[in-house]
Regions:
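Active-site-adjacent bridging/hinge elements
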Residues: 10-19, 78-84, 181
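Low-complexity, Ser/Thr/Pro/Gly-enriched N-terminal "stalk/linker" regions
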Residues: 1-32, 53-54, 58, 67-72
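Core domains of carbohydrate- and sulfate-ester-processing enzymes
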Residues: 160-178
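Conserved small/polar residues in nucleotide/adenosyl-binding loops
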Residues: 179-185
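Short N-terminal secondary-structure initiator segments
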Residues: 10-36, 40, 122-141, 145, ...
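Solvent-exposed loop and edge beta-strand segments that line ligand/cofactor-binding
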Residues: 20-38, 42-47, 82-102
């Protein structure tokens, strides 16, 4: 049973591979996501180390100058996905969102290095400064009172964005001024 599930996981990761990065699902989420890429790399590392590190390197290439690694990297502009790269209106080295996600990336890399060989150690070392910048960004941008508590500023940053945890707080948002969108991406799922 475990072997069958492992094979199924490999099939899904392979199907969602876009040549250097993985999408969570091909229709609903057609871009690279921070958390998803980290966890995908961990899975991919069990059968293809080179491809696993490529996933993380491509993710980190989208890192902002201030250290943030965005939660979405738009390698392509899919007109059926909202909010797409034009929505964010940012000036960065890549088309990205303006949110991040909690930094599980360091834990994933730690695991890949600890369970790997010298190749993994060298790759981990090559990403160390980027990881430090990412964590420093969290402590400077998301802990403004220096209390040691990192906060998030939007449900999408939690990695639990479609969870009922947010219903109470979002219930207070006046949605009258917002436009209802029916997106082809959502309708096709």
């Amino acid at each position: 049973m475990i072997k069958e599930r492992s094979q199924k996981a490999i099939e899904i990761l392979t199907k969602n591979d876009r040549g250097g990065y993985t999408v969570p699902t091909s229709k609903l989420y057609p871009h690279q996501w921070n958390w998803d890429s980290a966890f995908s790399a961990l899975g991919i590392s069990t059968y293809n180390k080179i491809r696993a590190w490529q996933e993380l390197i491509i993710l980190i290439r989208a890192q902002w100058k201030n250290g943030m690694i965005p939660h979405i990297i738009f390698h392509e502009n899919n007109p059926n996905y909202f909010p797409g790269p034009n929505h964010w209106q940012i000036k960065s080295n890549a088309n990205t969102s303006c949110h991040s996600q909690p930094p599980v990336l360091a834990s994933i890399i730690w695991d890949m290095v600890n369970n790997g060989n010298n190749y993994d150690l060298q790759k981990g070392k090559s990403l160390f400064n980027s990881l430090m910048a990412y964590h420093e960004w969290f402590f400077s941008a998301r802990d403004p009172n220096n209390k040691g508590f990192i906060s998030i500023i939007h449900p999408w940053e939690s990695g639990r964005d479609n969870c009922p945890d947010w219903d109470l707080g979002l219930h207070n948002v006046n949605a009258v001024s917002y436009t209802h969108l029916t997106l082809p991406t959502i309708c096709s799922v």
